[in-house]
């Protein structure tokens, strides 16, 4: 795979990465599950998934796509496509993260507990699925993202921990 293909894959997924990480900084407030419990007696999602974080991530990811358009308009073709793609990547990311939290609660994993694979690939796979109708990337680039995303996720978590935005470095 050529370097420009790797950069294109990274460029494509950038709104999703920002959408996934921004709730750490922008979150707080009312939990998405409103404190309700599932039929197993455990919280549906937990306090870590809030409306402010969800919509903050959606907005940040979409803004990243708009900025990308103005930096490299030929990649998208139109501002409308850039907004639509960034929005869907961001929405997919956040929905994927919510699904991951739901699964973790069912497995009785506490908030913030690392779930290797689920934490790194769940949001990525959901983002790619949501964005599929608008713009896809070649299989090789998807595979590259599957390899690089856990490393980026790990690095971002350590950075957020050192900045005091997260209580744990994972």
Curated annotation (Swiss-Prot):
Disulfide bonds: none
Localization terms from the record: Cell membrane
Membrane topology recorded in Swiss-Prot or TrEMBL: Multi-pass membrane protein
Entry keyword annotation includes DNA repair: no
Catalytic activity, as annotated: 2,3-bis-O-(geranylgeranyl)-sn-glycerol 1-phosphate + CTP + H(+) = CDP-2,3-bis-O-(geranylgeranyl)-sn-glycerol + diphosphate
Pfam family, one: CarS-like
Keyword Lipid metabolism assigned: yes
GO molecular function, one term: CDP-2,3-bis-(O-geranylgeranyl)-sn-glycerol synthase activity
GO biological process: glycerophospholipid biosynthetic process
Keywords for this protein: Cell membrane, Lipid biosynthesis, Lipid metabolism, Magnesium, Membrane, Phospholipid biosynthesis, Phospholipid metabolism, Transferase, Transmembrane, Transmembrane helix
InterPro entries, A to Z: CarS, CarS_archaea
One CC-aspect GO term: plasma membrane
Cofactor (UniProt): Mg(2+)
Pathway: Membrane lipid metabolism; glycerophospholipid metabolism
Record field: transmembrane: 9-29, 53-73, 79-99, 114-134, 140-160
E.C. number: 2.7.7.67
Role of this protein: Catalyzes the formation of CDP-2,3-bis-(O-geranylgeranyl)-sn-glycerol (CDP-archaeol) from 2,3-bis-(O-geranylgeranyl)-sn-glycerol 1-phosphate (DGGGP) and CTP. This reaction is the third ether-bond-formation step in the biosynthesis of archaeal membrane lipids.
NCBIfam families found in the cross-reference section: PRK04032.1
Family: Belongs to the CDP-archaeol synthase family.
PANTHER family, alphabetized: CDP-ARCHAEOL SYNTHASE
HAMAP family: CDP_archaeol_synth
Protein name: CDP-archaeol synthase
Gene: carS
């Amino acid at each position: 795979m050529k370097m420009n293909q790797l950069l294109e894959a990274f460029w494509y997924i950038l709104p999703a990465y920002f959408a996934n990480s921004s709730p750490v900084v922008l979150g707080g407030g009312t939990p998405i599950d409103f404190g309700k419990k599932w039929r197993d007696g455990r919280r549906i999602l937990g306090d870590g998934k809030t409306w402010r974080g969800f919509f903050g991530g959606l907005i940040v990811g979409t803004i990243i796509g708009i900025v990308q358009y103005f930096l490299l308009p030929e990649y998208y073709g139109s501002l409308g496509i850039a907004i639509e793609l960034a929005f869907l990547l961001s929405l997919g990311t956040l929905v994927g993260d919510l699904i991951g939290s739901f699964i973790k609660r069912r497995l009785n994993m506490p908030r913030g507990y690392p779930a290797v694979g689920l934490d790194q690939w769940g949001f990525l796979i959901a983002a790619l699925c949501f964005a599929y109708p608008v713009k896809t990337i070649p299989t090789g680039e998807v595979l590259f993202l599957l390899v690089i995303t856990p490393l980026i996720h790990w690095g971002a978590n350590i950075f957020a921990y050192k900045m005091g935005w997260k209580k744990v470095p994972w």
